Structures are given as C-alpha cells and as structure tokens.
Amino acid sequence: MSEEQLNKHTAPGHAKPRVAVLFGGRSSEHAVSCVTAAGVLGAIDYDKYDVIPIGIAKTGQWVLVSGDTRQWSLSASSLPEVSPSARTVTLAEIGGEHQLIVASPNEVPQELGAVDVVFPLLHGPFGEDGTIQGLLELSDTRYVGAGVLASAVGMDKHYMKVVFEAAGLQVGPYIAVTDRQWLTDPEAIRKRVDRLGYPVFVKPARAGSSMGISKVDSLEGLDAAIAAAREHDLKLVIEAGIVGREIECAVLEGRGTEPPRTSMPGEIAVAPGEHEFYDFNAKYVEDDAASLSCPADLPDEAIARVRELAAAAFDAVGAEGLSRVDFFYTPDGELIINEINTMPGFTPKSMYPQMWAASGLGYAELIDELIYLALNRKTGLR
C-alpha cells in the first residue's frame, strides 16, 4: 500500500492510519484468538500503522493490553488469556468522531483518539458471528473481514449449508439438531442419525477450532458426543462421515470490482496415531500431529475447480476481506464443500497465511492487503 493511499484514509491529526487490533473474546476460542493476535502484532509494520492492541476478557470487558503479546503461544500447559482490568476501553462518539476512551475508577477518562480501522481477530461466538461487526457498523467504523450477515452465516454450520445448497454447491449429508428437538424427542434424533449412517461427526453448530467435535462410530457413543458438543452450543450439526482428502483454499477479496482472489489449494494430513481427525490438539497444540502440503497434489483440473468453488462459496455468503474454504476430495474426484471460515486462524503457522505464502503473498504483505481492503471499503449498506 502506498503512502498516498494510507494518508487518504488517515483521521485528521494522525501521522499514519490507526489500527485497533481486537482479540480475546467471550468464546471458548479465546486462547486461539490471543495467539492469532500475537502473530499479527509481531508482523504488522509499525512504521506504517499506529497500532492499538485491545483485548476482550472472557467477562466481556475491553482492556488496553500492554506487554509483549507477541510471545503468546498455545501448548498443553499454556493457554494465553486477556486479564480483566480496572482500566477499561470503550468506543465513544466525541466531536463527531468515534474514539477510543480509557476509563478507570476515580480517574479522568483518557482519550486515545479516533480509530481508522479495526482488525477483529476474534474466533467463535460473540466475535466472529456478526456481533462485533454489528457494533462496528453502528459506530460507522471500518473493519477487516466479513460483514454482519456473512459472519453470522459463516459461524452457523447449519445455515451455512443451507446457503451453499441454494447456491448450487454440493454439501455432504447432515442433520441439524436444536435444543428443543433433543430435549423433547432424543429417540427421533437417534433414528435420524441412524439413517445418515455411521460414522458421523457431531459438531456444535456455532463453534470453531474443532471445539466440541467428536467422531462417532456407533449408536453407543452418540449421546456422549452430543453432550460434549452441547457444552459449546445447544444447537448441533451431525454430519455423515465422508471418505476423502481434506483440501483447503484461502480466499482474499478482490480490489474494487475485481472478483475474489484464491490461493493454491493445500491439503491437511493428520499423522497416524491418536488423532482420528483434525481436532483442536492437532491444529494448535501438537506440532507434529498434522501437516500442510501446498500446493496440494491434485490434477490441474481439480486445482482449478477447488479455486473456482472457493470463490463461489465466498460470494455465496457475501464474504469480504478473507475466508478459508474447506473441501473433501473423494476417491472418485468429487469436491464436497465442508465449510467456510470467515476469520480463519491467522498465526504465521496457520493454514490461511501458509497457503498465501505458497502462492507468493507473504504474511506481512497479507496483513497490509487486508488493512487496505478495509480502509477502502465503504461503511453502511453495500
């Protein structure tokens, strides 16, 4: 992004665009969000941007984060967390501008000034699901990533599939289970699952990072898997197991009227052993539990088709900024869309930036491009 382009969108009184990096949140993916933020805060160009790190504690409190968050990492014994503070951050309208205010008991509130763009690195409910996007829309604040509707659809695995099917994209067999349905007639649910055929995957409808997901091979394990998923969400999606390779594709919004850009597809391979599928530990905790091959070893026509379908999925939900689209590639060459993630993991080791790196766009450049897209996107209905 050129200096002229940056200055065009910089609030009066700012030498460079002010970027509020928002992370943490109330969801069970709080720690993952913190690690994502650590990656971005470690790579963003501080010569180009005035960066304000804002954490959301699990209580919902917004705090100004100090210290070296770039060292945060995930391990079996270490889950980073935003700590509540007496000094809270709010977004308030002052002099016709929406500004960040730091307030604490018995102190005069401190004005941090206007924000040019918010980079919400929030995963899961109350952040990735349209809630924070709605707040930012109400305050007429530009932000990175998908808008309210696309974020909400991308968070709900049930309605995501409804939208994909309406757009002519092939999804696998599944059922959606509401809280009321399970509580009032669990036997009917067991029969519906039996018709899907085992194995099945039981998932919280509105959770990510493989939280609460179980593979179930028979009726005997179904109720326990449902109970585990319901700890994360009372609405569930139960999917028939699909034999196929796990293929992913990164999507980046096009500039202006250009179509979405797609990376070379990558393939996830889970190492043989204790992980039956790509679960939370394989994703984030154990370095050798899974590997990414990019570009995936696929025929040229399959690679082209993955990229075409990934862009179609991006457009189907009305996404903006970035998304990662996941597929199954079956032995007979079918591509079945699994899901779209409108705020994918964004550490330097995450699949989304790795696929772009393999496609010629580095991590710092990717951050620049996302901020550029947000600064140049109009607010309000679009």
UniProtKB/Swiss-Prot annotation:
Its cofactor is Mg(2+); Mn(2+). It comes from Arthrobacter sp. (strain FB24). One of its GO terms (molecular function) is metal ion binding. InterPro entries: ATP-grasp, ATP_grasp_subdomain_1, D-Ala_lig_Van_CS, D_ala_D_ala, Dala_Dala_lig_C, Dala_Dala_lig_N, PreATP-grasp_dom_sf. One of its GO terms (cellular component) is cytosol. Residues 161-372 form the ATP-grasp domain. Mg(2+) 1 binds at D326, E339. The lineage of its organism: Bacteria, Bacillati, Actinomycetota, Actinomycetes, Micrococcales. This is D-alanine--D-alanine ligase. It catalyses: 2 D-alanine + ATP = D-alanyl-D-alanine + ADP + phosphate + H(+). The keyword Cell wall biogenesis/degradation applies. Cell wall formation. Pathway: Cell wall biogenesis; peptidoglycan biosynthesis. It is found in: Cytoplasm. Its main location: cytoplasm. It comes from the Bacteria. Belongs to the D-alanine--D-alanine ligase family. GO terms for biological process: cell wall organization; peptidoglycan biosynthetic process; regulation of cell shape.
